[in-house]
Amino acid sequence: MIKETFNFANNGDEFYTRLNDISKEIPNYNWANMIVYCNCDDPMKSNFYKYFKSNFKNLGIKKLFATYKSNNPLLFEFDGVNEKRTPISSGDFQANTSIINICNAIVTNPPYSSGMALEFIDMMLGSGKKFLIVAPLNIITKKKIFEYVNSGLLRIGYTSINSFDREDGSVSNSPSCWWTNFDVEKPFINTSFNYNENVYPKYDNYDAIDCSRADMIPNGYSGIIGVPVRFITKYNPKQFTLVGILNHPRINGKNIMSRILIQRNNVHEGTKKVRITESSYKRIFKDVSLYF
């Protein structure tokens, strides 16, 4: 079985988001009068803290906090003029709930693995605070994350990230994106392609057509379409409905990478949107995992 592979960090690795990537995403949101907390960020190394500190007045931030896990953890606090450093008992992102309680938004690159990303997002959604974090692109294939996105609790930011700097100076290529509960408005995907059965083959194990690129989604097609995982960075819920994740698609007996299953919202009159129960799907296609 062919799987999408990503170069995630080992437990001891540190991934640093590049300043250029941060500066392309942060200005898309309103930070006026916000208390911002970077809770996985060593201010001596983190470009998140550096960016917010250097753009404090331009963004209209009220206060900036940062903590990070270390043997001698410190709480950094910046008010636009002075920076205060206070020893704390723990720099773990789960430990400093008192700061989470007073902040308005949490912005960071959490420990870089799909498992930690799930834990972190759960914590953020439970906090009731705004958040903007960097995490692996393919966590969308996790059932809980898919459900968060499908329900509108979790959104994908405006830009993508493909490379990170490691502490040793090397570069890690890890397809990633911004995950947030801020409002995000993506433009519709407009293409000049129409459906052609020779261009858009059907899966052997599910009644849907395959579209290998988001910019080739056929116009006017009312059925279910399988698109690459990276489609989620272009997803606009006003244009498409997320039907599920096809984890083991096959075309003409050949296994291909996982697909997100989508359907246009503006289905032709008289055509019903396809919704399949999980039990009936499992009965028919036992080798395919589909989320609802």
Which residues are covered by each model-predicted region?
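Class I S-adenosyl-L-methionine-dependent methyltransferase catalytic core
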Residues: 1-292
